[in-house]
Structure formats: C-alpha cells, structure tokens
UniProtKB/Swiss-Prot annotation:
<dbReference type="InterPro" id="IPR044182">
    <property type="entry name" value="CITRX"/>
</dbReference>
<dbReference type="GO" id="GO:0009507">
    <property type="term" value="C:chloroplast"/>
</dbReference>
<feature type="active site" description="Nucleophile">
    <location>
        <position position="104"/>
    </location>
</feature>
<keyword id="KW-0934">Plastid</keyword>
<feature type="domain" description="Thioredoxin">
    <location>
        <begin position="72"/>
        <end position="181"/>
    </location>
</feature>
<dbReference type="GO" id="GO:0015035">
    <property type="term" value="F:protein-disulfide reductase activity"/>
</dbReference>
<dbReference type="GO" id="GO:0009579">
    <property type="term" value="C:thylakoid"/>
</dbReference>
<dbReference type="InterPro" id="IPR013766">
    <property type="entry name" value="Thioredoxin_domain"/>
</dbReference>
<protein>
    <recommendedName>
        <fullName>Thioredoxin-like protein CITRX2, chloroplastic</fullName>
        <ecNumber>1.8.-.-</ecNumber>
    </recommendedName>
</protein>
<dbReference type="GO" id="GO:0009657">
    <property type="term" value="P:plastid organization"/>
</dbReference>
<dbReference type="GO" id="GO:0045454">
    <property type="term" value="P:cell redox homeostasis"/>
</dbReference>
<comment type="function">
    <text>Probable thiol-disulfide oxidoreductase that may play a role in proper chloroplast development.</text>
</comment>
<dbReference type="InterPro" id="IPR036249">
    <property type="entry name" value="Thioredoxin-like_sf"/>
</dbReference>
<feature type="active site" description="Nucleophile">
    <location>
        <position position="107"/>
    </location>
</feature>
<feature type="site" description="Deprotonates C-terminal active site Cys">
    <location>
        <position position="98"/>
    </location>
</feature>
<feature type="site" description="Contributes to redox potential value">
    <location>
        <position position="105"/>
    </location>
</feature>
<feature type="transit peptide" description="Chloroplast">
    <location>
        <begin position="1"/>
        <end position="70"/>
    </location>
</feature>
Length: 181
C-alpha cells in the first residue's frame, strides 16, 4: 500500500492583522502600516484649532483639575444629597438620573445622547448625573453595578422607578419618558 501525502501551498500571502509588523528581511526594524501614521504637522495644527475653539466656549481651567469646563451643559452633575432632595420633593416632571464615570467610554457616548434629550425635553423632564467615583457609597446604595446606569423616576410616587444598565439607544429613552413615566 502506498501512503498518500498531501501538501498545502497557500495561494495568497497571509493577511496583516496588526497595525505594525516586523520585517523578515530586517528583523529589528519595525514597519508601520498606512493607518497608524499621522503627519505631525497636520496633527499639531488640528490640535491647536480644537484647543482654541474649546477655550473660547469654556471658562478658565479649574484650579483643582486643570481642565476646561463648559458652563452651558443642560445635564448638571449633582451630589447624593441633591438627589435625595429631588426624590423627596414634589415634581411635575420625570427625573432621570445618570450614574456615570469620567473614564467610561459608553458613559461619554450616553452623555451626548442625554444632552440631546435635555434639549428636546427641556421643560418636560429633569435630567441629572452622578459621578460614581465621587459618590461611590451612594452608587453602591443604589445598586449601581455597571456603567452607565439610568434611573427613570416618575413624578407619580405610586409608579415604580425604571432602571437601565449599559448603553441604550436614544429612542428607547424617549419611549420610556413618553410611555412609562
């Protein structure tokens, strides 16, 4: 009996899956792909125009953090004490509480959508946010496990609050505000 031998010859070179790779001809030289390079002159000019426009709409940097802070955000950052007063007090509009962190990517995306909702529902809903790094005990008491977490609280004290966790579409937030609160 003869044994059959199979050999495989790839027809195309292997795909490059990384932003950089090592050259087999020169093992110590690192080659960059087209997508990983940004012209330093272009990068510097883009940063300077972005920085100038940001500085023109922001107040001077906060002494503690050194960051520029916009003053015209509709969604205001509040403390745990402020939230407790808002919940206990009488409201004519629903209250939406966003538990977020500054380092959380989905929280940043959600903040943009909440700003759009705040413009859309300016007089029909109150939207506030709580930084879980600053108010970690309050976040723990509110059972915030994942970020971002939203609480939708109806002005009617007989209705249960609605809790969502994770990034949700803006249309879902509209539906909750319009139909469930």
């Amino acid at each position: 009996m003869q044994a059959a031998t199979l050999s495989f010859q790839p027809s195309a070179p292997p795909l490059q899956t990384s932003a950089f790779h090592f050259s087999s001809k020169q093992p110590n030289q690192l080659k960059y792909s087209l997508f990983s390079y940004t012209c330093p002159i272009l990068k510097r000019s883009l940063l300077s125009t972005q920085t100038l426009s940001r500085k023109s709409i922001c107040k001077p940097p906060d002494v503690a953090t050194g960051k520029y802070v916009r003053e015209d955000y509709l969604v205001k950052k509040v403390s745990a004490k402020d939230i407790q007063e808002l919940i206990k007090g009488e409201r004519n509009v629903p209250l939406i509480i966003d538990f977020y962190a500054t380092w959380c990517g989905p929280c940043i995306l959600m903040a943009q959508e909440l700003e759009m909702l705040a413009v859309e529902y300016e007089s029909n809903a109150l939207i506030v946010k709580v930084d879980t790094d600053d108010e970690y005990e309050f976040a723990r008491d509110m059972q915030v496990r994942g970020l971002p977490t939203l609480y939708f609280i109806s002005p009617d004290p007989n209705k249960d609050a609605i809790r969502t966790e994770g990034l949700i579409p803006i249309q879902m937030m509209r539906d909750i505000i319009n139909n469930d609160l």
